[in-house]
Amino acid sequence: MNKLEFRIKKISYSQGENIDLSSIPMMMRRKLSTVGKIAMSTMLDCYGENSGDIKLVYASRYGELERVVKLISQKKENNEVSPTGFSFSVHNSTIGLFSLLKNIHSSYNSIAGGEDSFSAGLLDAVMNNEKTLFCYADSVDKLESVSILIDYQEGEKVVMKGNSEHLPSNNFSEFINGGRYVCPLYILERADD
């Protein structure tokens, strides 16, 4: 990997505090799991007043695990599962609901890359080479979500370059707090305009 340059227009991060879902219709809100609610909250904050189509990328190590565990219990106890519960247990259900809510018709990807889910999803979002909303959310080890509005016209200039020196990985919160983000594949750091 040489280097990729892009801009970050906005970052929204939450560990479960200040989840605002008031703009979501009640019927849709009821369909969201815990991880879906926190993801939807950060995506809505990042997306803001944008309108029209935008690429979407969602990443999660465990996805809708909470819902899957519930379905397994239902199957064990009643020998059947809720069709609605089943349909919302898929990995891309949250990003699908977001696209419905915001009337987005462009494609979206849902990434599960184990412990590298965040870095794989962010790389996928950057590789779109156009305005993209990226969201990572999980609820197993800790409840958290980060959404990033990637742009090529507006925002803070960022460079993604290969981690050829094999620097040790850190958490994306380092980048949020002004440092750089390091994962096994790449390094993400701010660049001069």
Annotate each language-model stretch with its function.
Residues 1-193:
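Conserved "HGTGT" condensation-loop signature of ketosynthase/thiolase-family condensing enzymes
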